A protein has these predicted regions:
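Sec-dependent N-terminal signal peptides
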Residues: 7-16
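Positively charged n-region of N-terminal signal peptides that target proteins for export
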Residues: 1-7
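Primarily EF-hand calcium-binding motifs
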Residues: 70-72
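Terminal recognition/anchoring or ligand-binding modules at protein termini
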Residues: 22-56, 74-152
Length: 152
């Protein structure tokens, strides 16, 4: 790996760790290394960022917390991979997104959550909704959402 890539990777990780408010660096490092982010890891990011649990929460409990709050439609197995459409839906539950008409009518259904994130330039429009998301992509999208939708 070139020196510039290493420096950029370190800066990126530091930015992510800061934007996720002190979440366990071990978990963030693990997510960055994943070819596919898991449901457990995705739910962990969401519950810790929202302050629904501390950073010691396990993935299974994170899934149950989001399920009980209605932020995910079903309690999936924690090691399942995450498709882009489902990642967009989980992220849309974190922030108050002023979406388009269909997004509001459907209460941010997965389809329209993804369309909104694409419309807002967070996710490239050419991406297939059912493609599996890598850990680094999930954190990139998380950071972009945080910058775009976080209340100032």
């Amino acid at each position: 790996m070139s020196r510039m890539k290493k420096i950029l990777s370190v800066l990126f990780v530091l930015f992510i760790v800061g934007s996720v408010y002190g979440q366990s660096s071990k978990v963030i490092s693990q997510i960055l290394e994943e070819d596919e982010i898991t449901v457990g890891q995705l739910c962990y990011l969401s519950v810790v960022y929202q302050g629904l649990a501390n950073e010691d929460v396990n993935f299974k409990d994170a899934i149950n917390i989001l399920y009980e709050r209605g932020q995910i439609p079903y309690a999936a197995y924690e090691t399942n991979g995450v498709a882009l459409i489902n990642l967009a839906f989980v992220y849309s539950q974190i922030w108050d997104i002023n979406g388009g008409l269909m997004y509001r009518i459907t209460n941010g259904s997965p389809r329209y959550a993804l369309r909104q994130l694409k419309s807002d330039g967070i996710i490239p429009s050419r991406y297939d909704p059912h493609r599996m998301v890598s850990g680094s992509e999930a954190l990139d999208i998380f950071t972009a959402c945080s910058l775009k939708y976080q209340k100032k």
